[in-house]
Amino acid sequence: MNEYDFDLVIVGAGPAGSSAAFAASSEGVSVALLEKEEAVAETVRTSGGTWIEDAKEFGIPEACYNPISNYSFCSPTKSVTISDEKPKAVVLDVRKTYRHLAEEAQNSGTKLFVNTNVIEVLTDNNKPVGVIAKVSESQVKFNAKMVIDCSGFQSVVVKSLGLAEQWSRFGAGAEYEVKAENVQSDTWWLMVGQEYSPAGYAWIFPTSKNTARIGVGIGKPDSDVDLSLIHI
């Protein structure tokens, strides 16, 4: 079994993991950033809506997002649009943004390991001191002084340590990114009501003048909709 020693092991190379890795390695901490997929942001699980101030705070380049200045909210019977003189929100190019953050972490000294799926958390007196991960058909041991769980919904580290259980409340959804002509690129739409989504909402988030994300999400267990039936 191959073995590595790091000050810090971070599980998950999403925005939280990459940002934590960048902050730590910028201070001279040796960091291993582990991503189970074959590439960062191989699978996207968010529509990318956020505030422009937050994007700028994290140094996200303008090429990674589409500014939004109009916000339309719709129900089956009413609708309202709120407008700002200047954009206050953005829709991220999620894949490009996540990969930018991971690249920034690597440039600061972080070692990124992709296709690296954590299967065991190593402990010493109930303190996490590393992980064992599956890489292709082999296993790799990562020793660490500290482990940070940034694996999102799966929470592989904290669940292994008994610090968290399976989420009892969560959201699930489906989304398509589509091409369309003359998209109103500075406006996003949120739709609420049982006709659109039981215990949830639907959305149209423009990513450019000719592309948009169209999706629907529900809350569980508030909605009894069979998750396998979610479609757009």
Located regions from the model:
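Predominantly flavin-linked oxidoreductase catalytic cores and closely associated redox partners
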Residues: 108-229
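Glycine-rich FAD pyrophosphate-binding loop
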Residues: 25-44
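Helical element adjacent to the flavin cofactor pocket in flavoenzyme catalytic cores
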Residues: 92-118
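Beta1/beta-strand and adjacent pyrophosphate-binding region of the FAD-binding site
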Residues: 2-14
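Short, hinge-like loop/turn segments at secondary-structure boundaries
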Residues: 48-52, 165-166
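N-terminal Rossmann-fold NAD(P) dinucleotide-binding loop
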Residues: 17
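A conserved beta-strand/loop capping segment in the N-terminal third of enzymes
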Residues: 51-100
